[in-house]
Structures are given as structure tokens and as C-alpha cells.
Amino acid sequence: MAKDIRVLLYYLYTPIENAEQFAADHLAFCKSIGLKGRILVADEGINGTVSGDYETTQKYMDYVHSLPGMEDLWFKIDEESEQAFKKMFVRYKKEIVHLGLEDNDFDNDINPLETTGAYLSPKEFKEALLDKDTVVLDTRNDYEYDLGHFRGAIRPDIRNFRELPQWVRDNKEKFMDKRVVVYCTGGVRCEKFSGWMVREGYKDVGQLHGGIATYGKDPEVQGELWDGKMYVFDERIAVDVNHVNPTIVGKDWFDGTPCERYVNCGNPFCNRRILTSEENEDKYLRGCSHECRVHPRNRYVSKNELTQAEVIERLAAIGESLDQAATV
């Protein structure tokens, strides 16, 4: 299948004057050329992923590079056969990635233009992965890690990036007096978080420059030492990274078998991202727990228009019922 769609991943920390108006103007331009995607704009900069055909994406890159302060913005480009987004969103936010330091009673937010970890090239990062005296920390959410991660990297038990500072403080014995290198999808989270670690007093902090997305495209390392796939926040869900010896590390939520298919839990008040096969999605009503399976607003049940009798039958098949907890 021809790959005539380009997906652009990018960010830039740079002061943006009147960022709310900038976001409105940016949205208008994106819509005028037929671009699709999701862009966040804040006083501190811009962070986005967009997709379109070659002509459209080229127009967009030229436009962004014409904006004051964004002449050298780095676009990471994937070639795909289908659009990665269905609509176009540009939103003004307080931060382009929500670390939430002020919300969580930390001192002040981090300005990566002033404080950030040392940049590591893909080759240097690979060397760090092989160094037994270096701690490698994945700064992404737990469900991103579970789909794929660097071999030996620490998995933080977090569901949101803003939980990471407190998690590190609670687990500081893993990091103190050690060299720490961090990584994320494209680099935007690491720019800020590595700066926070420097401010916290960690003496030797590095970050994978350009993120996993760049590591997978580097002609020298070719994504080696990455296991699984990389989670992305668009219609693709997962993309390849390791072009040397790819593996599957994702495990089905229900039976532990190898799996790289993500869905959201059927309970809208849970909405947990879970890996599961289509067969197990049907079997377990897309509920990550008994409570979620029997929730009155279970989206899987409503979407498939299951009758109560059909729900009871499926629950019985896995040893559960509507009015009692799971027996298996």
C-alpha cells in the first residue's frame, strides 16, 4: 500500500506572545489547508502531531518555519498509508505537557530553556542502556510502557505524567547518587522532567534527544534494545521502533498472552487503556474488572446492543453474575 500520508511530530519550548490568539490563528490556517491533528499551544511553546498528504504537510512546515522564533523547529516525520487523525484541534493550555508542579505543591514550574538534562544522541543513549551503572527511567504513562519500552528501563507506576515527580520522590532510593537518563515519545516530556530532576539535586541527568521516535529512525542504532512497539496518541496507536530484532512485550489484560491491541475499558468512569484481543474483548465485555463489566453505562454493552440475558450469559461463561463478585 502506498504511503502518501506524512505524520509530523514536533514541539518547541519558546515564549509565545498572546498564545490564545496564536492558537486561534493557527487553527484557522490548519483548517484552510486541510490538515488534521492535535496541537497544544501555551505561553511556554507548542506541541503537536498532525497528518496530511505531502503537499499539505509541506505547506504546514513552511508556515511554522516562517513564524518568529520557530525557524529551526524540528519535525519528526513518519510516512503512512492512512491519516493519523480524523479532525483538527488546536487548543490553548497552561502547559504544552502537564507536569503540574504547582498543582502538586512543588515549588515552581520548570523552564527547559533554563534548566534541562544533557542531550544524548541515539548512539549515546544506547551506550547508557548497556551501562550497568546508569539508571534508565521511562517518563511515560504505565500503559505506554506496557506496549513497548527500552530493555531494562524502570516502569513508573503512573497513569498521568503529572504523577511522575511524586513517584520519583517516593522512590528516590532508585536514583540518588546514580547517573539517570530519561526518555519519552518525542522528547517534550523529558525536556521538562529532566530539568526538574536537575533542580531536585540529581547530579548527572541525561535525556534521549528527539525521543523514541528519533531513536527508531537512527541509521546506526536502528531502534535496537527497544522491545515491543511505541504507543502514539493518534489513530495508529502503535508504531514500530526496533528494526534489528523486534519483539512483542505487550500482554493481554485477561490471559497474559502476547498482545499489541489497545482498547479503553467499557466503563466510561474507568476508561483504563488495556491490551486485549478481539476475542477477549467480547468475552469480558471490554471491562477491566467485574465492576466495569456490570457497570450500567458499559459502552461495549450499549454499542453492541446486548440484552440483559446476553450479558448474563457472557458473565456466566467466566464465572460471574450481575449481582455478585467474580468467582474466578
From Swiss-Prot:
Its EC number is 1.14.-.-. Pfam families: Rhodanese, Rhodanese_C, UPF0176_N. The active site is at residue 184. It catalyses: uridine(34) in tRNA + AH2 + O2 = 5-hydroxyuridine(34) in tRNA + A + H2O. One of its GO terms (molecular function) is oxidoreductase activity, acting on paired donors, with incorporation or reduction of molecular oxygen. It is an enzyme of class 1 (oxidoreductase). Residues 130-224 form the Rhodanese domain. It comes from the Bacteria. InterPro entries: Rhodanese-like_dom, Rhodanese-like_dom_sf, Rhodanese_C, TrhO, TRHO_N. GO terms for biological process: tRNA modification. Gene3D superfamilies: 3.30.70.100, Rhodanese-like domain. Keywords: Oxidoreductase, tRNA processing. Belongs to the TrhO family. Catalyzes oxygen-dependent 5-hydroxyuridine (ho5U) modification at position 34 in tRNAs. This is tRNA uridine(34) hydroxylase. It comes from Streptococcus pneumoniae (strain Taiwan19F-14).
